[in-house]
Every structure is written in structure tokens, then in C-alpha cells.
Amino acid sequence: AEVATLTNSALTLKGTTPTLTIGDAGAEDTKIVFDGNAQDYYIGLDDGTDDLLIGLGNAVGTTPAISIDENLAITTAGDITMGGTTPTLTIGDAGAEDAKIVFDGNALDMHVGLDDSADELVIGKGSALGTTAHIITDTNGIVRMPLQCSFGVRLNATVNNATGDNTRYTVPFDAAEWDVNSDFDLANNKFVAPVDGTYCFNAGIALAQVATNHTQIDAFFYDETDNWYQHNLDVGNVFNNSNNYYFTLSATIKMAAGVDVVAQVQVANGSKVIDVFGASYPFTWMTGFLVG
């Protein structure tokens, strides 16, 4: 073997195209080793993987910090710190393609990326942009959460003789205008919170056959624990000339996952003759969404 040792010297390659070649095309690792006092480092070609490695120690393939493969894909084995006065990480080269960061999890992958076809910043599930988007921001700063809990339901047909004699009546919403995650249980006429959070609810209830002897009306959202009272008055003095009365409810409620919410109405001091209007459009209705 031929060995050249330079002591207390520097090696300079000159010329128009100075080149230093490590290796002779043989099937072996080639490397440069930096022989330090406390730590050694190497830069080398790992012949087994055909990757260029920068690593700790003097043996190629052990404790690599950075590897570059034949497709120019770079893999780092440690943390990356960007310093300077204005540290910037740029993803993409202004090409007409998606650019993204993928978080490769154990059971679930997530991504943050620029969807080039829509010109939108997307945060979503999986590794492919445009599929299962959770948060979308467009060029105008409009933010959408297409999978956020949101619903609108209505009473499809009029229910006769629901209250009037102090019966506390749960409005049986049975048709959905929309329900993003199917969180409203139409079979049991109630909303079921999918996650812990704060929810906003609104409702409009239309009553018929109200009479002057119906002197009290109460209406509220009920969340299995509390009555969120919205309405209390002498309904027998405020109905219209068709003996109908329309009113709305609104409440923001902090709920645990699995808790139910229903809309209820109770009219007292008269006969049980009051109907709740229903229709093929939102006549008596309820909406809600997750605030956060």
C-alpha cells in the first residue's frame, strides 16, 4: 500500500479543474476521516447502500448524521437548528407541484403543505395533499375546517297536541339539512357531543293553537344536567292572529364528549292542544357547531 503523510502541512490542488478522487471504482467504502481529540467524524461513500454519509466515528455506516442517496433524498438522524438573524426554511422551488411536510407517525401520518392545484395551505391527515384536509387557508386568508362538527336539522312534519298542559316536550328533530360528522342522532332526536369542547346551538320553534289561557311558556336547551333557559313569558298574550307563536333559542355550552343536548318547550295553564310546526323546509329547526 502507498501512504502519503503530510506533517504540519497543507495540501493544495491547483489548476483549472482541480479534482481529488477518493477510491478506484472498487466495491468498498471510501471515506475521509477527521481524527479529532475527543470525537472523530467521517465523510464517506457507503458501498453497501450507495449513500453518501456524514457521521460520527471513523467507520462508514455507523452513527450517520446525514445521508444522501442516488435520488438526492437527504435523511438526517438528529435535530436541525437554523441560526442567523432571519432563519428561513424554504420548501419548494416555485415549480407547479405540491410542497409539503409529512409527519410520519406510528399509527397516523399528518401533513402540512401547499396544494398547488388549489393554491391553498392545507393541514390534514395522511401523507397525500388534498385528501382528508382538516384546516384549509386560501389566498384571501379565509380559513375553513371542512370536518369540524356542524349540523342543521329540522322537524319534518307537524306534531299535534305536544304541550299546553305543562307537558315538557322534546322537539323531535328527524331530518338533516346537513350533518358533517353525523353527530345528531335523528333516531333519538338529540345531539351527541363527539369531543370535549365548547359548542354553540341555535333553534327556531314554531307553535300553533296557542290560546289565551296558555299563560306561561318555557323553552330551553337541556344538556342532561342544566336547563339553558331562553324563553319565559305569558304566551297567551303574544301569539299572532292565527294563534301561532314563533321564537328562537341560542346558547353556548361547554360539554364533555358523549353528552346529549335537546331542545325542549313547555307551555302551561291550558289544554294540551299546542302543535309544533314541521315541514319539508326549516320551519322548526336546530343548528349547532363546535367552537373549540
Question: Where do the model's predicted regions map?
Answer:
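Self-maturation zones of extracellular/virion spikes and adhesins
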Residues: 2, 9-64, 70-132, 149, ...
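Short basic coil micro-motifs at the edges of alpha-helical modules that engage polyanionic partners
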Residues: 3, 65, 134, 188-190, ...
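Generic beta-strand structural signal
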Residues: 6, 45-47, 68, 114-116, ...
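Extracellular jelly-roll beta-sandwich "head" domains, especially the C-terminal globular C1q domain
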Residues: 138-292
